Structure formats: C-alpha cells, structure tokens
Swiss-Prot record:
The name this protein goes by in its record: piRNA biogenesis protein EXD1
SMART domains xrefs: 35EXOc
Notes concerning its domains: The 3'-5' exonuclease domain lacks the conserved Asp-Glu-Asp-Asp (DEDD) residues that coordinates divalent ions essential for exonuclease activity.
Claim: RNA-binding is one of the keywords in the record: yes
GO biological-process terms attached to the record: meiotic cell cycle; piRNA processing; regulatory ncRNA-mediated gene silencing
Organism: Homo sapiens
Ranges of residues in domain 3'-5' exonuclease: 30-122
Keyword Cytoplasm: yes
Function of the molecule: RNA-binding component of the PET complex, a multiprotein complex required for the processing of piRNAs during spermatogenesis. The piRNA metabolic process mediates the repression of transposable elements during meiosis by forming complexes composed of piRNAs and Piwi proteins and governs the methylation and subsequent repression of transposable elements, preventing their mobilization, which is essential for the germline integrity. The PET complex is required during the secondary piRNAs metabolic process for the PIWIL2 slicing-triggered loading of PIWIL4 piRNAs.
Residue ranges of the region described as Disordered: 384-422
Complex formation: Homodimer. Component of the PET complex, at least composed of EXD1, PIWIL2, TDRD12 and piRNAs.
Location within or outside the cell: Cytoplasm
Protein keywords: Cytoplasm, Meiosis, RNA-binding, RNA-mediated gene silencing
Amino acid sequence: MEDSEFLAYVELLDEVEQGSVRAKASSVSLHAERTWMEKMKVEDLNVCEPASPAPEAPATSLLNDLKYSPSEEEEVTYTVINQFQQKFGAAILHIKKQNVLSVAAEGANVCRHGKLCWLQVATNCRVYLFDIFLLGSRAFHNGLQMILEDKRILKVIHDCRWLSDCLSHQYGILLNNVFDTQVADVLQFSMETGGYLPNCITTLQESLIKHLQVAPKYLSFLEKRQKLIQENPEVWFIRPVSPSLLKILALEATYLLPLRLALLDEMMSDLTTLVDGYLNTYREGSADRLGGTEPTCMELPEELLQLKDFQKQRREKAAREYRVNAQGLLIRTVLQPKKLVTETAGKEEKVKGFLFGKNFRIDKAPSFTSQDFHGDVNLLKEESLNKQATNPQHLPPTEEGETSEDSSNKLICTKSKGSEDQRITQKEHFMTPKHEFQASLSLKEETEQLLMVENKEDLKCTKQAVSMSSFPQETRVSPSDTFYPIRKTVVSTLPPCPALEKIDSWISPFLNLP
C-alpha cells in the first residue's frame, strides 16, 4: 500500500468509525478501570476526545540533553496522537522510514494483567505520544503492530519484559529486534570487570547517570514520575493530560537513543583498542620482520593475545574494589536518593578506616559467568575468611540498625556463631591488655595479674601495651581487604586500554554511613 493510499485509508476509517472509537474510549476495559471510573465525574469523560487535534509542544532536544546547557536549547517537538484523523497516519509513515527508534510505555501495571495507556515512540527528530487508552487496539491494527514486529527496525527499550508481555497477551503482538539498554548495561559491566556479573540491574535513571554522565538535576522528571505514581497509581488514566505529564512521557523515550550509542561505544572499546594495535603491528615495526612472516599464517597474533591479559587485570581490579555476595555476584553500589546526596555533598566521610573526599570514585560490583570464574570467587571468599580468622582486629563493628538482608550480601555472616565469638573476642581485645589474651591462665595467675594492674607503674606499662597491640574501635577494614591481601603493583608492559582506566564518576559509595 502506497503512502497516499495509507493516509486515505486512515482518514476514511476515522470519518466512518470515529463515533464508535469515541464511545469505546469512554469505556475501554470497563472491568480493569472500574475503580477509577467511580472516582471521576461524568463531565470529565466528555473531554477525553478533544474536538481539535492536540497541539504540538516543545520538548528538550536529544542533543541539548547531552550538552547540559539550558541556554542553548535545540527544541524537538512531541506530538500527542489521540485520534486517527490527520496526525496518526503521518506519524506512522514517518516511523516506518526509520532504522532505529526508541519505545517506552506507561500505564497501570503494564503486563498481561494490567492496562497500557501510553506508547511513546521517539526518532532522531520527533517524539510521538500514542494515547492507547483512547485509541484502543485499533492503533496497533493500523500501523503500530507492523512497526513493533518489523525485524528491520531496531527498537531501543529499557527493560522490555513488561511491555513484551503486555503486547503479546493483550494485543497479539510479538515484539521484535529490540536493543534493551538494561541488558546492555549488564553486558558492559561484565566486560569492564573481566567476566563478573552485578548483583542487580539498573534503573533508567542510574543508566543515564553512569553511561551518559547526565547530572541528576536533569533527571528530576523521573523522580517526579515516580512520586506521581505513588500518590495516584491511576494518574495515566486522567484526561485531559497536563503538559508536565506529557513532557515526562516525551523525555522517557528521548533519552534512550543517546543511551544506546553510549553503551555501544563502551562495549566496543576492546575492539577499538585491538584494532589500533593491529594497525601498528607492521607499519611501525622493522622491515626485517616482514620477510619472515607468512601471509597465510593463521596463528593468533600477539596483539590479540593481549585480550587475555586485559581480562585478568580487570578481574583483579574488580576483586580489589567490590564486595561479593553469597551467590558469587559482586555488590553494585546503589544510587542514593537526591536528598541524601545533597545532605552529604562537600563533606568527607569516614569509610572503613579511610577518609574519602567528595571526589572519591569507585567502580561497581561484578560476578563470574563461567565455571573458572566461580572458582576464582570461591578462592576470594576463602582468602577473605582466612584473613578474618587470623586478624580478628580487622573485623568491622556491626551497626545496630543493620538488617538481615544487608548482612546476607556480605562475606562476613553476622548470624553465625563463629562470627559472634570473633566479635566478642574483638571487643575484649580493645578493652584488655595484650598479655591477658594468653590462653589457659589459672585462677591464681589471673589474680596475680589483677593485683599487678593496681600498681601504677604496671598500669602505665599496660596502657602502652594496649595502644601498641590493638586498633581503635572506629577502625574499619578497607574495601580491598575484603578480597585478598595487598600485593605489590606490577607495572604492565601492555598498551593502555581505555576500558581498564575507566572509573564511574557518579558513584559515591557508603553515603549512608556516618
């Protein structure tokens, strides 16, 4: 069907059946929306279908979001599609011509049991907001299904599981050719840490801060969205929709396209490094080497063997900087709420025996994917436990408000009897002279020692012994001690790898510690 015929078909459909579509919009899924319908007045339902097409409103540009400069805004318009007349057909034609687009969705519990209200589709220059609550399944039959199932069009989505389930079971649509930014984040994390996996996935906000380095203040719309949903889970059913909500819908889809590009760049960093080495293999080497090299030699070149060394260095780096939970997954630092970040900004925090300034950076926590990696994790655990057994004074004190869930993600199990004995021994170590730690002292010997303590000179010597043999109670083990002992740094002879030197600047760990 040609473009002109398609537009004429949509226009004819709208003129003939607009009345039935409008009637259906007021009672879409009566069973699912019975609760919100009881709260709304009858006159509110009459404005669900505006008489004139919804106006186009400016949204923040994709390029401007990356510049972080409000004074240099480059506007990209978003268009609300809430009826088939005029704009629906033109929007479908524009989207069909794209190779890559981003898709987001909003509604009440978006899955097979929930209700899809909005479907946001963004291209490089425009954002379309399809009001599925008003348009109904006819919107998919008249173009959207064809786009969502098209294997030639790449759809960028953050966590596609829920939308895929909803489209499949409610509309019979099989979502195809998807680039999921949540999956890509885990894959990039595994590559960056030499094969480890994180203990959790990231939200859209966390992904934007980490990979696009977007300042949290530019992502306030995501916090506002979450707050609105908590206050009123049926906020997406309300008509007419406020401009602030429409902007939130547009920005959700807008950020996904540059996020995909950033993730691709990070995942391709190894390829770029190895190719650069390939380019310089012969042209910067001696000419004598070329005479003895067979062009048909298929052995793995030395330049590509560096990838093995890269992965080894990354595993060692990750083991020094992250904690591992009971499942062998490295604990990822969770982005703190904006309020906590503001309260602690500019202050130095005492973290496990060290003072870190506000510019302190640390990577996230990964986990192994193969059997060899699981063996390395077990080795790390054994070394950590051995260190704790031989050096009880390094055990960090347990905080009173610590939950069992947090403790389950640590190598030191606070519930075990052995650990409790170690903590008791540690406490006594801080409060007791060093010579009192000797085992199997008789009652007579203990009495004699107590009498000796009463002597002023002996008491003075005892205090000196305590100060030299024990650590202060506030001293905590550093993150690197959680894995294995300190080793001398070996200067690598390998060429620099950008992925090895990358440190996430957005993470400020242990913000909740005093």
